[in-house]
Amino acid sequence: MVLDRPLAVGADGGHGVIRYYVSEYEPGRRVRFTFRPRTGIIGAHELSLDTLDDERTRIRHVLIGRARGAMRLMFSAVVAPLHDAVVEDLFDNAERETTGTVVRPATWSPRVRVLRRLTGGR
């Protein structure tokens, strides 16, 4: 994920052909990315942090949207598996950053490995 400026409402970015902009941002709590129309997804995805107690925080990722056009075919076959792998990597990175280790690291399926090679690693 690359943004054209520091994280703030209005920052534009994405990864590969998936494009979005920051539509809502609460520093340290929540960020919502709304998909650009040309992406073929009408909707948004959001990351949020919920403090559970002094020792635990829940990281939540929610994807709300509807695919249209060619994305209807691409989503299940290509986008969803790559997206899930990226989110799992993000959660692993957050765990590593906060605890110094990852108890159960995510692994990429053979399908994700092939798709990453075909899409240039995005």
Language-model-detected regions and their locations in the chain:
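Glycine-rich portal/gate segments that line the openings of hydrophobic small-molecule binding cavities
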Residues: 1-44, 93-108, 120-121
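Short terminal or interdomain "cap/linker" segment that borders an active site or interface and mediates
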Residues: 112-122
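Beta-strand/loop substructures that line and gate deep hydrophobic ligand-binding cavities in soluble
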Residues: 37-89, 105-107
